[in-house]
Structure formats: C-alpha cells, structure tokens
C-alpha cells in the first residue's frame, strides 16, 4: 500500500509546478492595474472656419489662440499681399482646362511665434475654396514643389509643434522678423479668385482681398 504522506512529499504541488508562470504573471497584473488608473483626455477640435479675421485692405494683423488639451498656442503675425500673377514662366504650367495663379505674400512675426504647418487657399466669388495641390504640370521629372507651401522661410522655420501641441524651441538659423511666401494655385479656366485665405486649422483664419 502506498503511504499518502510519501506521495504528497514526492509530488510537487500546483504552485511549485507553475511558479515560473506565476512569476511572469505578477508584473502583467501590476501593469494592468496601472493602466486602469491612467487618465485619458479627449481633445475636441473645431471643424468649421467660424472665426475669420477678414481684411478690406492688402494687409491683416492676425492674432489667434488655440488649445491642445492643456497647451495653448498663440499666433501673432502680419500677412500682406504683395502681388498676384497668372501663368508666368517657370517650372510649373497649367494643366489643360486650368489657369495657374501665383500669389506673393509677405509675413512678419516675432521669431518665437510658431507658424509652421499653415494652409494657403484661394476663394472665388461663390465662396469655393481652391488649394495649392493638383492641376499643375511640372517640367520633366520634377515633382510639384509648390503643392504644399510653407508660411516660414526655408531653413529657418522658427518654433515647431510636437504631436501634443507643445511648442518646441527653434534650432539652427533664427527666423527673420519678415520674409516672402509664394503660393501657386491651379483653378478652372474662367474662374477668377477674389480672396486669399491663410490658416493653421479651424476655426480661425486670415483673409485678404485680391
């Protein structure tokens, strides 16, 4: 007959057989508890351009603030229309059925103001909006470098934004206090632009007449 005490002593218990699995499980339980107590924040962003700063002259002093959670960004910049030309000679020509418009702007702002990731658009008399991408034929194999213009000078963008809206300090060459910006548009032939709009996302925008 088998001695029950001997059987118990000779066979490892369940906890002993699975001690490695238990040891690996404990850190996972700690992470799960920590994740359950993590505070999530939902950021709601406006989707319409409801707060326009519309000028009746060729210049607009644009001042606007926007919030990314607990981070607030303030933009303070003067935007001026320098000139507008149609189908001038260059590396970009109009695709069939379109007309290319070249808009020259001048920006002026303190070097510490974040101005990257802007959007420049044209509007017609019906309020239709036209962007800078598409409708243009480039020379040879050159890509359309005018599709997404920046509102900052090349090599000196000034402060940039992190994914959470945090303003990152500028690196490299300091941004000047004023500089030119060129935006190139292709619009349907026969459509006349009446205004240029500059923004960094809704709801705020600056608008100048042409």
Task: Please give the residue ranges for each predicted region.
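Conserved functional micro-motifs across diverse proteins
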Residues: 2-210
